[in-house]
From Swiss-Prot:
GO terms for molecular function: ABC-type putrescine transporter activity; ATP binding; ATP hydrolysis activity. The complex is composed of two ATP-binding proteins (PotA), two transmembrane proteins (PotB and PotC) and a solute-binding protein (PotD). This is Spermidine/putrescine import ATP-binding protein PotA. Part of the ABC transporter complex PotABCD involved in spermidine/putrescine import. Responsible for energy coupling to the transport system. The gene is potA. It is a peripheral membrane protein. It catalyses: ATP + H2O + polyamine-[polyamine-binding protein]Side 1 = ADP + phosphate + polyamineSide 2 + [polyamine-binding protein]Side 1.
Amino acid sequence: MENTVQNKPIIELRSLTKSYDTKTIINNFNLTINNGEFLTILGPSGCGKTTVLRLIAGFEELNEGRIILDGEDVTDIPAERRHINTVFQSYALFPHMTIFENVAFGLRMQKVPNADIKPRVMEALRMVRLEEMADRKPTQLSGGQQQRVAIARAVVNKPKVLLLDESLSALDYKLRKEMQNELKALQRQLGITFIFVTHDQEEALTMSDRIIVMNKGTIQQDGSPRDIYEDPKNLFVAKFIGEINIFDAIVIERTDEKTVKANVEGRVCDIHTELTVQPNQKLKILLRPEDIIIEELDENESSKAIIGHVVDRSYKGMTLESSIILDHNKMKVLVSEFFNEDDPHIDHSVGQKVALTWHEGWEVVLDDEDEQ
């Protein structure tokens, strides 16, 4: 029964269209969000992700389409009656009120009996580990603590959905990492659907059950963090999520159902793909820096692999990143290897000749024209 409830749609966005003056921001946008899900909407500035959030919240009016919340059409219902709360980037705390009164504000607006307010506020503050700071003012709290107050205020009236609009972007790196873990743990504890908007790819991968990647008002890919990172469906998603190397390839022939022989940057390679291909067809081969294997070569040594020379290296603690210029076309390739101080060949010298291969089957293969 619990799985059925969890898999039940809590929000359905049906053919949403939103324009400002003559500019269309969202066009025929469709999305189903399940109960208890941590969904992140990810995309560059101006892609329409915040507009989607504001439409769900009821802060913007649709031009076309319907918004369904827990089976009820709320398209024409005002924001304050939607059982949806929002945590903004600015937190929007009242500076003249105590933390307790900030969290209690929404309950008082809803005319909740005074006898019920204190236990509910203290329960919310306990969830975010701030019950001992109930009498302080927001200015007496750190940025991370203010963030937690904003979350407590948002969840105290038990909304069906919590919206978070770039709500970690104002924090420093260390605190942001801590809050990512806390938010995910809190979401599991509450069982509330979280919809999180960000342009930070690492944040999305860390926190989400599911990611929507947007560009120009449309969904480019909808999938788990692992799917989005390891199996991007087009070049936009591949380039937007993390570092990636994109190689040009020309099909020679298909050798079996899952393997194609192709010329990749001047070298004949076997690539794994089930795409329907023809001889001389152009493809793109996508490899993450950690997918690539480096083998050092003597300067006069030959290899059937892709050849290049190390032009830069960067030690990053757990990993060593090497920048390599290919001999074939001067393309720059980024390679990331786990650092092993006992391996004499891991710390490649600038100028070192190298052969590049990759872990079999780790490549992503796309049609050459598949960029959006």
